[in-house]
């Protein structure tokens, strides 16, 4: 008899709780309105982060600067697994990341074209987000190599020409790496490099710009 009474009290308590939650939810949703839009509003200004300025179209979503958010919990754990796994150690096993005679570190190098920035984009971001001193130092080795490769006319990086036309795909990817590095460091050299490089690009005739298949299909 005592067990039946306890069971009835438990059921009544559960029903009462569900009823209260339902009433609260109904009251809340009744006072709210739902508006469907094709895309997020871009009229308002984000005071914390800079979006594109005119004449460029404002961004619907603003990418947060690398390192502005510190990961915790399982996200941090997975990033640490990347650091301790292939991403963090690819330089030890990849022929393309071999520093000796690498085209990003040595003028006239014979390897390491787009493969280096493909890897460095993720590796550098991982270093900044985890604030890992060893990885940051490795990243800066390559970034300093980029700065050292700058030429008086604004060009930077490996020189790879086909029929008098320079292949620019590797530089296009490295610009992403430099963007992340600037977000992390605010190093003015990044702005100077990009400004000079884009001025150089403006001097390239249209029939010689992005003519290679690989960069033309993506650039």
Q: Where do the protein language model's features map onto the residues?
A:
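Bacterial N-terminal signal peptides that target proteins for export
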Residues: 2-14
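N-terminal export/targeting leaders of redox proteins
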Residues: 11, 25-28
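Bacterial N-terminal signal peptides
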Residues: 13-23
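Glycan-recognition and catalytic cores of secretory/periplasmic carbohydrate-active enzymes
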Residues: 17-18, 28-219
